[in-house]
C-alpha cells in the first residue's frame, strides 16, 4: 500500500508504470468502441484514476475526446484545464444539486459564489473550455436566486473564455515544483480528497492554490528528471520544494545523490532561486537533515 506522501521506491514506480501501460491499453479499447458508434468519449476525472494519470505520456494513447472533472478550487481547475491531448476540458462547479445544500435554510448561492470566485483566478491563467453543474434539477429549481446567479456565472465565463482562449498569459517567472512525483501528480500535490480542508496539509495545499492563479509558468519536476538532464534547470527561475521532512514532497534520500546536490548548487550559483517550505528533507541514518 502506498500513498502520495510516502517516498516511492523504484519497485513502486515500476509498478505504477505497469499500471499505466495496462490500464490505458484497456481504456483505449473502450474509447475505440465509442468512436465506432460515432460518439465522443469523455472521462470524468474523479476521486480515483489510477493508471489514467492525465499528464503522463500513456494517457495520450487512449484517444479520449474530452475530460470533465469537479472544480473545488483553483488547483483542481488547473488539474483539469492543463490536461494535454484532448479536444476540450470541462469543469463541473459546486455546489452539486444535492440535499446537503439544497434544503430549507440552505444557502446554495453562497457556496456557488465562493466556488466561482475561488476558481476564476485559475481560469485567467488556463481556462477550461466548458462549465456545468450537476445533481437533481428538481432541487435546484426550488431556489430561483441560485438559478439567477448561475446564469450570471455563465455569462461571465463566456466573456472570460472569449478573451483568454488561445492566448498565452503573461508570466513573470518560470517556477518548478520539485518532488518525487513531478507531472504525475501535477496540481495534485498535497491534495487529499477533493479540495477539502485538512489541518495537516492546508498550508502546503495553499501554496499550490496560490500558484494556480499566479503569473508564473508552473512546471512539476522530479529528482529523476534532474538526474536524466541537469541542464533542464537552465529554463527555470525558481525551484520550490514544499512539504514535511520525510515525505515524497521533499524527497528524503534523494538529497544524498551528488548529481542532485551539484545540479541544485550550480542552479543557485548561477542566479536561480531555491525556496524550501515546510521541513528540511530527512535523510535516513543521519541525525541531521539536508541543509
State what each model feature region is.
Residues 76, 247-249, 283:
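Short glycine-rich, flexible loops that bind phosphorylated cofactors or substrates
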Residues 33, 121, 210, 263-267:
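Alpha-helical scaffold elements within enzyme catalytic domains, especially in hydrolases
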Residues 5-9, 13-16, 22-32, 36-201:
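Hydrophobic targeting/anchoring helices
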Residues 37-41, 127-130, 172-173, 214-219, ...:
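Loop/turn elements at helix/coil->beta-strand transitions in domains of secreted/extracellular proteins
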Amino acid at each position: 500500500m502506498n500513498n502520495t506522501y510516502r517516498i516511492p521506491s523504484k519497485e513502486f514506480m515500476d509498478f505504477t508504470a505497469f499500471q499505466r501501460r495496462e490500464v490505458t491499453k484497456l481504456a483505449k479499447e473502450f474509447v475505440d468502441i465509442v468512436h465506432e458508434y460515432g460518439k465522443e468519449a469523455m472521462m470524468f476525472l474523479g476521486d480515483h484514476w489510477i493508471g489514467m494519470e492525465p499528464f503522463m505520456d500513456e494517457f495520450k494513447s487512449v484517444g479520449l475526446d474530452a475530460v470533465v472533472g469537479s472544480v473545488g478550487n483553483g488547483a483542481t481547475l488547473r488539474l483539469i484545464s492543463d490536461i494535454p491531448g484532448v479536444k476540450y476540458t470541462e469543469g463541473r462547479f459546486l455546489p452539486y444539486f444535492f440535499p446537503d445544500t439544497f434544503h430549507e435554510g440552505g444557502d446554495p448561492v453562497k457556496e456557488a459564489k465562493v466556488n466561482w470566485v475561488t476558481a476564476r483566478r485559475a481560469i485567467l491563467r488556463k481556462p477550461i473550455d466548458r462549465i456545468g453543474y450537476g445533481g437533481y434539477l428538481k432541487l435546484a429549481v426550488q431556489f430561483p436566486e441560485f438559478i439567477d446567479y448561475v446564469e450570471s456565472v455563465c455569462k461571465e465565463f463566456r466573456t472570460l473564455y472569449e478573451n483568454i482562449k488561445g492566448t498565452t498569459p503573461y508570466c513573470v517567472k518560470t517556477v518548478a515544483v520539485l518532488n518525487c512525483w513531478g507531472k504525475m501528480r501535477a496540481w495534485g500535490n498535497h491534495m487529499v480528497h477533493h479540495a477539502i480542508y485538512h489541518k495537516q496539509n492546508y498550508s502546503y495545499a495553499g501554496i499550490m492554490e496560490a500558484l494556480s492563479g499566479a503569473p508564473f509558468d508552473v512546471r512539476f519536476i522530479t529528482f529523476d528528471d534532474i538526474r536524466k538532464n541537469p541542464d533542464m534547470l537552465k529554463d527555470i527561475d525558481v525551484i520550490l520544494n514544499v512539504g514535511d521532512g520525510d515525505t515524497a514532497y521533499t524527497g528524503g534520500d534523494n538529497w544524498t545523490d551528488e548529481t542532485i546536490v551539484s545540479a541544485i548548487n550550480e542552479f543557485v550559483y548561477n542566479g536561480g532561486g531555491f525556496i524550501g517550505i515546510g521541513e528540511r528533507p530527512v535523510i535516513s541514518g543521519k541525525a541531521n537533515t539536508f541543509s
